[in-house]
Amino acid sequence: MNFLKWLIPSRNERELKKLWPLVRRINEIEAGLQKLSDDELRQKTADWKTRLSQIQDREELARTLDEILPETFAVVKNACRRLTERKTEIIVREHPLLWEMIPFDVQLIGGYALHSGRIAEMATGEGKTLVATLPVYLNALTGRGVHLVTVNDYLAARDSEWMGAIYKFLGLTVGVILHDQPPRVRREQYNCDITYGTNAEFGFDYLRDNGMAARKEEQVQRGHYFAIVDEVDSILIDEARTPLIISGPSVHTYDEQYAQWKPLVESLVRAQERLCARFLSEAEAMIKQLNPTDGSNPQNPEALENQIGMLLFRVKTGQPKSEGLMKFLEDPENLKLMNRAELDLHKDQKKVDLYREKEELLFAIDEKGFEADLTEKGRNFVSPKDPEAFVLPELTTLLHEIDTGPEPDARKRMEAKTKVQQDFETKAQKIHAISQLLKAYSLYQRDVEYVIQDNKVIIVDQHTGRLMPGRRWSDGLHQAVEAKEGVEIERETQTLATITIQNYFRLYQKLAGMTGTAETEASEFFDIYKLGVLVIPTNEPCVRKDANDAVYKTRREKFNTVLNEIKQIHALGRPILVGTISVEVSEQLSRLLKREGIIHSVLNAKYHQQEAEIIMRAGQRGAVTIATNMAGRGTDIKLGPGVAELGGLHVMGTERHEARRIDRQLRGRCARQGDPGSSHFFISLEDDLMRLFGSDRIVKMMERMGLEEGQELTHPWLNRSIQQAQKRVEQHNFQIRKRTLEYD
């Protein structure tokens, strides 16, 4: 097969081969530009702008841009050369940064891919940020505005200052859209030749312009000509599940309901904890019966095994993250019994037994579907004196009965109808408030899905690890979380305007994107956005050493090993970047390192203000940095003096993410541009990915090998099994995105 690959070049290789003559042409032109003065070089920008401003026809404009592409790319490359040779210092996010970048040949190819409306897949560290300057400069000459879309405000501000040095040197204007800017400032930024910002800011401005601006003068955007999306997989795939929503104060607000029902839901959650603890102690007693210490044979072992499996399944359904359950499942035999019980319950198409098992609980939690539902037992607990408390009557039937009833007085009939409607609304509000509070208590975890800052609940973006101030969960969920945390419950909102990310980006005449990881989702990019992917070769071969994943039974064993590896690598003087999946885990690991006396930095949603300084220090000798997936994108960790000789940056992942791309992004923080580096991922069977989407094959393999406490399992086959689990989640999320688009 490898022989055939060598014999028949891939489509990607054929595409690249066609582009090398263009690269040679750009370099020839650039050599000739070196004798021009700065003013003569800048004059080219003015001349092209004048020429392009006279072209109205879209096809003619596209032809002209293709025609001038070699010279415009050469001009950008020459401007970079001048800034480098003059050792120009640029102030980026209040830090002086020496300009030392001149586009490589492979970056020129990346620039062409973007101009032609494709996704350029470039390995992390290959300078995607610089690549974008080539097509951005070319298309900005049209005067129609080019939008460069980043994953967060920090990168938008950073890149507008950093890459802005090139554009300004060549005579173009650069703007940046940031959270909390007033409309007047936003309008000025959009009127620049080039505008940086996040997808959310661009999308919300579009919604405000088209849903809330009364006059054209109140609008801030001026059209959708060309957008380049940085980290395109994060924005067009990961975030595409969430539509952008502008909301206003709700006409009817029931915020007091959440505070009113909070004590009841709290007592319900505590009662469920006691119930699950009882099931676990019953299971423990049965396990002792199954394995008697006196060597005798247990009576009816099969029935005992079934009962143990059912009890463990109940706890998994009622309290899936219970520490007691995790401890039980450390024994592969118990895990096997629970999985077998679950399989038996799902065999019956009518799900009678499954329903009966769930009815032993007060509420059932579905982690995959992010749902929590009261059972009959739970409804009786919440409302023991009113069995109909959670049954909504048929309103139209009740109103019809009043209209056709014996009451002759029209006013009294109207009063009766008003009372029926009010009772119905009160009941519906109560059911809704209790349902949302139950979700808040059982599915939304502090320092994972959200953090508390300044007495407010702030959502944490699960893909970027960053805070999302100003964003609120809809449908009363945010109020439920506020009630749970005892902070001020803000007023409920109603949707005024909404658009999906997919449909917003379809507004652009031309769309392109960059990422280190697009090939895995190439078909989705093409199906939804009609974007092809061109994989750009690296400038220097990657010499990173990727160790096989280390798999442990428990989180405790996993973190002990992570700690030991940090100590070993730290003793060598190599810098270490430890990736975590949530704020909570990053702080837990930080406490362990403090106990060991290891000086380190923490980069998570709570400390995002120090991001630039932390990243600047992360590649220095002996540095230890713990980071959520905030550090996975757009951050360039440069190695300090003498670090390359020690082996470069060592990246450690404490868990596999739902999306393989995010793991690849973390790995890509090291061994950039031919530097040395290494990576190692650590996994436990208690991690969410393995619990929810993992395979029984891994458990069976660990069982066969009879692993002792603290022993790890590593094998390339195991890596494939973990990737299969990730693929299952990706497929699950792809179906959600398809449905989101269908209903927009």
Please tell me what each predicted stretch does:
Residues 1-706, 737:
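Conserved P-loop NTPase motor core
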Residues 696-733:
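C-terminal helicase lobe
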Residues 733-744:
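C-terminal accessory/connector segments of nucleic-acid motor ATPases
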